[in-house]
Amino acid sequence: MAYAQYFIGNSYLNPLTDPKVCAVSLANVTFEPGCRNHWHIHHAKSGGGQLLICTAGSGWYQEAGKPAVSLEPGMVITIPGEIKHWHGAKADSWFSHIAVEVPGEETANEWLEPVDDASYAALESPAGEK
């Protein structure tokens, strides 16, 4: 699958596990400054979801209807299944995280609309800094 279509800006995906060998998918994802993925949902009948282990730079994580969370190295974000969210780099920083796909029953990712530029830019303003 070509994931670039689900990102604004450039990101780099480095799988850390082989799905033929390991049931848990881990990947290092690096976002260039300003890069973010689209809103998306990790669906699962049970279990599922995603963990983000922040490793470098500064980024954002946001769930639909909630304020964005500023991400820094060492932080771990737990995203249950069925939560609409997005994540990516801040405008002035590269950002990397290890993405862990939590095993579950009948899991599937649904990619949705892009995070619009105005909403993203508002996060970067001093009043919007979280």
Language model regions located:
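Short beta-strand His + acidic residue motifs that chelate non-heme Fe in jelly-roll/DSBH
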Residues: 38-40, 61-62, 79, 84-91
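A short hydrophobic beta-strand segment most commonly corresponding to one strand
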Residues: 78, 92-111
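Short strand-connecting beta-turns/loops that link adjacent beta-strands
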Residues: 21-22, 46, 66, 92-93, ...
